[in-house]
Amino acid sequence: MNELTGESGSAAPSIALNDENTMPVLGLGVAELSDDETERAVSAALEVGCRLIDTAAAYGNEAAVGRAIAASGIPRAELFVTTKLATSDQGFKGAMDACEASLERLGLDYVDLYLIHWPAPALGTYVNSFGGMIQSRGNGHARSIGVSNFTEEYLTTVIDLTFVTPAVNQIELHPLLNQEALRKTNAEHNVVTQSYTPLALGKLNDHPTVNSVAAEYGKTASQVLLRWNLQLGNAVIFRSANAEHIASDFDVFDFELAAEHMDAINALNDGTRLRPDPDTYEGS
């Protein structure tokens, strides 16, 4: 057993961030979920012990997340809430104003993590945006600040020009795109890699390698994919609107994949990107 294992159904372990805060290693994301789906999913996740909820201004469901959190009765200090700066709000003042607007929608006094959603390099505003987020952290609106979808170039540019290192870089990461080089860069800068789309949009559910490993442990394909990602040392965000799937996906702390099975899943890497290319994408 390692620090990622424990009793089935227990809360997720936490990972240390570079700013002395901590973050649960596993949480629920709500991208592309309707308000009703979001409220149900967040409520279901909180019920099974999940304490990290990841939303974004661009998802349009921050208010629904806030309602589910309020209805849960769970003390704010026990929760870890992430939201993200929309590309349309980028800029120094834009980032600060957008953070306040997100807090209003969420019904919260602060977020635990505030991320730049996409670098949108063609706009040339991601460095100034991070500067605004530094201010948001300074005034207590965000406990930790970070980036999402940042390549090595954009990450190091932010660090070099603002003299502040993001706490987290949230990136697409699954066995088809294991991001080995970027994970190494993040680690060299003491930035936590947080994976999204860890289940590869279901494309690996019927893969013989994944299924054979799952059968070996008596687990689902999704559980094995999440466990693989966690054992790489990443924090992970998974998405589901189904309460049973949420409970199952969160229940990954009572087993450990052997090195041979980690290697077998790692071997599926072929560079397939299922989400937009950060170098060219200007949406969200």
From Swiss-Prot:
EC number: 1.1.1.-
Keyword NADP attached: yes
Pfam family, one: Aldo_ket_red
Keywords per UniProt: NADP, Oxidoreductase
UniProt binding sites for NADPH: 199, 237, 239-241, 248, 275
Highest taxon above the source species: Bacteria
Disulphide bonds in the chain: none
Database matches in InterPro entries: AKR, Aldo/ket_reductase_CS, NADP_OxRdtase_dom, NADP_OxRdtase_dom_sf
UniProt key word Oxidoreductase: yes
CDD domains recorded: AKR_AKR5H1
Residues at the catalytic site: 59 (proton donor)
Gene Ontology MF: a single term: aldo-keto reductase (NADPH) activity
PANTHER family cross-referenced by the UniProt entry: 2,5-DIKETO-D-GLUCONIC ACID REDUCTASE, NADP-DEPENDENT OXIDOREDUCTASE DOMAIN-CONTAINING PROTEIN
Family classification: Belongs to the aldo/keto reductase family.
Protein name: Aldo-keto reductase MAV_3816
Protein species of origin: Mycobacterium avium (strain 104)
Source organism phylogeny: Bacteria, Bacillati, Actinomycetota, Actinomycetes, Mycobacteriales
